[in-house]
A protein has these predicted regions:
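Conserved AMP-binding/adenylate-forming core of the ANL superfamily
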Residues: 11, 15-70, 87-92, 145-150, ...
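A short helix-loop-beta submotif of the ANL/AMP-binding
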Residues: 41, 53-54, 60-80, 84-88, ...
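Conserved S/T- and glycine-rich ATP-binding loop of Class I adenylate-forming
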Residues: 55, 72, 103, 174, ...
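Structural core segment of the AMP-binding/adenylate-forming
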Residues: 74-152
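Conserved AMP-binding/adenylation subdomain of ANL enzymes
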Residues: 198-216, 223-329, 340
Length: 359
């Protein structure tokens, strides 16, 4: 899928990620995305990974997670993401349960947790570290950094093997095992095949006609979450630019920097947005506060009491709504960072009625 999109879009930006040292968003083109996936796929062969084996990804959301995913799929491998906040004991359980041989880790926390578990995981052979700033344990003689891993695939020395494996790939192949967070007992693995994703993409192609390759999606939820993982695959399939938010706590900042048209999230995100707006209104006084309260009232009447049930709003109500749309609503959306919004899928729990009405 990535290689096909590279042929179509070339040097158009496919991914962006935030460089925390420079505070700049770094673009990755479709060509670079494809090239890195090919290199990583060759590197996996160089490591001796056999078809239909399990590899793990223990990291925050990073471009390397996607590089590794698609490189694995090219080799008919199964990727198993671990929550970035998993303890050493939780990581150990999943590594042993899935018999993971190679584990890709993000930053210092994940490396430390994984290395602590290493001696208790008999299948585990090597850690591959995304972040070059990670300090290795003095006892560690086997781990390598991701750039060293990619160097194993430089000039694509095993491309014939990769292409042979890709040719043998089937929708019946296992794509991921997604483990639950383990908050109510031992984590449980959910097996997802490629046909699961293919069918999800097929039906979304039919239903989400408003989604185009002009859209920009904020990757906010962890890629260990099936909602975000499937959504990101859909975005890649549709040629949507994906901007990767590394640290969940930073979303209020990054969403204002990117101002996405798309973002999947959970109700809790919108609850926080709603609470923030209510707090802002409470701090206002006089005419400004009265206008904000009236704008919310007008919006609810216009969209919920009339449009949602197929009625035409009265002219005066419609004119007030249009006025607020260019003033109060525009200000609130810009303050949040969603003024360019196309749509924002939300799942995981029911969204409270007052939040739905507000949004």
């Amino acid at each position: 899928m990535v290689h096909r999109q590279a042929e179509k879009y070339g040097d158009k930006v496919a991914l962006k990620y935030r460089d925390y040292e420079t505070s700049q968003w770094i673009p990755i083109t479709w060509n670079k995305f494809s090239q890195t996936v090919r290199q990583a796929a060759n590197a996996l062969v160089a490591l001796g990974v056999e078809e239909q084996r399990n590899i793990g990804i223990f990291s925050q959301n990073k471009p390397e997670c996607l590089f590794t995913d698609f490189a694995a799929f090219a080799n008919r491998l199964v990727t198993i993401p671990l929550y970035a906040t998993s303890s050493s004991a939780q990581a150990q359980y999943i590594i042993n349960d899935a018999q993971i041989r190679f584990l890709f880790v993000g930053e210092q926390f994940q490396y430390d947790a994984a290395f602590s578990a290493f001696g208790f995981c008999h299948s585990l052979q090597k850690l591959i570290i995304f972040d070059r700033n990670v300090v290795l344990d003095p006892r560690d003689k086997t781990s390598i950094y991701y750039d060293e891993f990619l160097a194993l695939g430089k000039d694509l020395p095993h491309n014939d093997v990769v292409e042979e494996r890709t040719a043998r790939a089937s929708d019946e192949d296992l794509a991921n095992i997604l483990y639950t967070s383990g908050t109510t007992g031992e984590p449980k693995g959910v097996m997802l095949h490629h046909f699961n994703y293919r069918e999800a993409i097929r039906i979304h192609d039919i239903r989400l006609t408003a989604m185009t390759d002009k859209d920009v999606s904020m990757n906010f939820l962890p890629l260990t979450h099936v909602f975000e993982k499937a959504w990101t695959y859909l975005c890649i399939h549709r040629g949507v630019q994906v901007c990767i938010n590394l640290r969940p706590a930073d979303i209020q900042t990054t969403i204002k920097e990117i101002r996405p048209t798309l973002m999947c999230s959970v109700p809790r995100f919108w609850e926080k947005v709603y609470a923030g707006v209510q707090e802002k209104i409470a701090q206002e006084t006089g005419l400004r506060k009265a206008m904000m309260l009236d704008a919310i009232k007008v919006g609810k009447m216009h969209n919920i009491d009339y449009l949602r049930v197929g009625k035409t709003p009265p002219l005066l109500l419609h004119l007030k709504y249009k006025f607020y749309e260019k003033t109060i609503y525009a200000l609130l959306k810009k303050t949040i960072g969603i003024e360019n919004g196309n749509f924002f899928p939300t799942a995981g729990a029911a969204v409270p009625d007052d939040i739905c009405e507000f949004v």
